[in-house]
Amino acid sequence: MRITHDIHNHTTLSRCCYDPRATAAAFIERTEELGHTVFGISNHLWDEKVPGASAWYKNQMISYGLQLRDCLPRDSRGLKVLLGVETEYAAASDTLGMLAETAKQFDYVLVPHSHTHMRDFVMEDNADARALRAIFAERIAAALPELSAEQVKKMANTLGYTDIDAIVASGRFFEPTVDMEKYVADKMVESFNSLMANSEFIKLAAAVPTSVAHPFMPCGFQKEVQRRIINLIPDEVLLDSFSRASALGVAIEVNTASLRFPEDDYAEEPHVRMMKLALKAGCRFTFGTDSHSLAGLDSIRKGDDFSRVVGIGEENLADIVR
């Protein structure tokens, strides 16, 4: 099937967008060239009515995101142009970053559950990471007794998750006790299922077309690690999770940026197994590039062969993208 829509991408209004050319007008022009019929823009936003936004989200509130309306060109080039949003599910506190009532201002909502690089916000630090930070805090306090407890804590938390994970794995301070890949796999299953049970999410999904962004894709890891983590999740567990989404009428996103192994007709791509199980569970699908650049929109073509391999046809697409 040739994919003729893309409803997951980020313009310069998203803080993570790195391409100054990634404007709504430029996106629409390129998507017409790609042969799309439906195009939706989904910048990262957090509802200011919901407490608990991370520092990264605090400057990306609803009023800010709605400025996109003024950026859309009058000539949509025959495209069905949608104003969407990618909000957040902070699984560590079971907090959905958008109220259902607020979501009605958008044509659709994408909800990720696997931003596993957002530690202690989306995914809790594991016991080893906490133990390492405690060692740092103890040594900083001993070396610099003039610092307050809060200042010591800030210094101990200075290193990001990639450094912390690497130091733990090295065994320089202690022998690791947590299988990190299994931990992440289990946490993603936990976060997906808790999202499906979240009362605000259930209301939101009933109010606005909703799709789970890059499901079970552990963000922030190298591609070989990502593949191993996904492959740790058993078929029956994925089928159960996708059945919960299907029961709520929640779509599943095929995120072309997450398709990291296109060789030999995606023979080693873990998303093939995953999406076949979503199809078996009766889920509908949306496709998105998750592009943060103008050039990234072209990756939608990965979806053509991928949909054929999985068996996704027009009849399996969510209504919003038809």
Describe the role of every protein-language-model region:
Residues 1-94, 101-103, 221-236, 240, ...:
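An N-terminally biased module of ancient metal coordination in phosphate/nucleic-acid-related enzymes
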Residues 39-41, 109, 212, 252:
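Hydrophobic residues within beta-strands of alpha/beta enzymes
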Residues 53-247:
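Extended substrate/RNA-proximal surfaces in nucleic-acid metabolism proteins
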Residues 246, 250-257:
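Generic long, charged, amphipathic alpha-helical segments
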Residues 254, 262-287, 295, 299-304:
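Extended hydrophobic/aromatic segments used for targeting, binding, or gating
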Residues 303-315:
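Alpha-helical oligomerization segments
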